């Protein structure tokens, strides 16, 4: 996946903090949606095509370095040496959350720490995909805590901006319907209408026009998504 850096000083927060807030949102949403997509492909691997994980890797834009469906599921979920694993995504959320503890509150961070502890539990690892509902529930609670506990609008909106960027990219990669893409884009617009300094306005206008043309799926849209933050 392409990376994205926020380098413009925002009104009340530093460049470094803006980056951490945005990536906190992106990584948390990446965990949530990766698990969602994995469930669908896991069912396909059981019921239809045991090599469905190959298509998953292609759509995610990652290397297929797995020897089998079983190897894929184990390493994609629990392998701390695999930079694309869910456990590693959670560690990235945690790294940002620890540095932002004062902004997001300890209670919010606890949902991520609980998720990591769950992933490292041998009993949960033995259950595999069946145990991942707990992680999904924790991420939903994390987002609820973001909404409930963060009173600073600028901080909350920057995190949400990252969330919707990630949501747009992954839904595009997995070729969800144009109507679904537009729904997520509208949520992103709602966020940046409140704090428009977050967004690269020319790129935003280009993306609006592209969605109006309804030329989708379109790999160029993924590039635009990853160019939407001010650089």
Regions found by a protein language model. Name each.
Residues 2-231:
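Alpha-helical transmembrane segments and their helix-helix packing motifs
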């Amino acid at each position: 996946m392409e990376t994205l850096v926020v380098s413009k000083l925002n009104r009340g927060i530093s460049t470094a903090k803006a980056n951490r807030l945005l990536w906190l949102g992106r990584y948390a949403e990446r965990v949530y949606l990766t698990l969602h997509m994995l469930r669908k492909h896991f069912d396909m691997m059981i019921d239809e095509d045991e090599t469905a994980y190959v298509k998953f890797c292609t759509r995610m834009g990652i290397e297929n370095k797995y020897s089998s469906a079983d190897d894929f599921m184990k390493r994609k979920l629990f392998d701390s040496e695999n930079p694309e694993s869910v456990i590693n995504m959670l560690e990235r959320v945690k790294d940002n959350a620890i540095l932002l503890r004062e902004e997001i509150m300890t209670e919010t961070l606890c949902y991520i720490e609980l998720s990591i502890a769950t992933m490292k539990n041998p009993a949960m690892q033995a259950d595999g995909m069946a145990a991942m509902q707990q992680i999904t529930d924790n991420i939903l609670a994390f987002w609820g805590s973001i909404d409930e506990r963060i009173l600073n609008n600028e901080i909350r909106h920057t995190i949400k901006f990252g969330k919707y960027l990630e949501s747009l990219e992954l839904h595009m990669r997995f070729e969800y319907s144009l109507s679904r893409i537009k729904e997520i884009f509208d949520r992103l617009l709602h966020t940046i209408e409140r704090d428009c300094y977050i967004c690269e306005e020319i790129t935003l206008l280009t993306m609006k026009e592209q969605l109006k043309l309804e030329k989708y799926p379109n790999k160029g849209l993924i590039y635009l998504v990853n160019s939407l933050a001010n650089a």
